């Protein structure tokens, strides 16, 4: 996260989950349980989630991925957000509007932050949302969600959690704003999901990656020890 977004993120961290925008929660559980922070919070709610990850949603039930427009050398999401990489800060790529994004070299190597996002997603998010952002039988495919959900809406729900109640189930998304294993890498996770959603990054572990920069290490150490 850049210094320009610090004020917004502080507000987001204390935001009430009830204020989250209408739409899809980032992580859900079938049981009626309070939102909670911490690594593996969703798994703690469901009991044996680590041993039995959520089943992936059947392919026939998945909605078609929204189109991503490429005009004048720029990538624009269906929500109008430009995700073209513009500059690097703290070892991460950002757009001209300081929104985190990804960059893949011509030979196929992903930037380190996007690779970091893959690792953090696989460690913290896939139990509910399925591997590679593909979704599950009870949680959405985040690779699709990020194409229509704004970056700050993504942060708000990730920080504060969300609860959706309907006639079929009571779905709970835990809050991760105080979980450093997630929050210190939230931009990386977002960039990874963007790369998956646009189709620029295939499923599985990225085959090639850039090296981890000193700037990334410094920011990582500062966040994890803060």
From Swiss-Prot:
Residues 1-22 form the signal peptide. Residues 43-68, 203-226 are annotated as: Disordered. GO terms for cellular component: periplasmic space. Keywords: Electron transport, Heme, Iron, Metal-binding, Methanol utilization, Periplasm, Signal, Transport. GO terms for biological process: methanol metabolic process. InterPro entries: C-typ_cyt_methanol_metab-rel (IPR022411), Cyt_c-like_dom_sf (IPR036909). Heme binds at residues 125, 128-129, 173. Coiled coil: none annotated. Binds 1 heme group per subunit. It is found in: Periplasm. Induction: During growth on methanol. Transmembrane segments: none annotated. One of its GO terms (molecular function) is electron transfer activity. This is Cytochrome c-553I. It comes from Paracoccus denitrificans.
């Amino acid at each position: 996260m850049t210094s320009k977004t610090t004020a917004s993120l502080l507000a987001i961290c204390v935001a009430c989950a009830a204020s989250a925008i209408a739409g899809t929660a980032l992580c859900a559980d079938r049981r009626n349980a309070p939102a909670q922070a911490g690594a593996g919070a969703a798994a703690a709610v469901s009991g044996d989630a680590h041993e039995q990850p959520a089943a992936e949603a059947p392919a026939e039930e998945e909605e078609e991925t929204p189109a991503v427009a490429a005009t004048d050398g720029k990538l624009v999401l269906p929500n109008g957000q430009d995700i073209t990489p513009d500059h690097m800060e703290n070892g991460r790529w950002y757009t001209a509007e300081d929104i985190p994004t990804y960059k893949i070299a011509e030979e196929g190597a992903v930037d380190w932050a996007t690779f970091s996002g893959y690792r953090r997603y696989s460690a913290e998010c896939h139990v509910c949302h399925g591997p590679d952002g593909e979704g599950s039988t009870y949680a959405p495919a985040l690779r699709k969600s990020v194409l229509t959900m704004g970056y700050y809406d993504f942060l708000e729900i990730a920080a504060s959690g969300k609860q959706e109640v309907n006639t079929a189930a009571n779905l709970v998304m835990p809050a991760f704003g105080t979980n450093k294993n997630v929050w210190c890498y939230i931009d990386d996770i977002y960039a990874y999901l963007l790369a998956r959603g646009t189709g620029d990054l295939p499923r599985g572990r990225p085959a090639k990656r850039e090296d981890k920069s000193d700037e990334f290490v410094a920011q990582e150490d500062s966040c994890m020890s803060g």
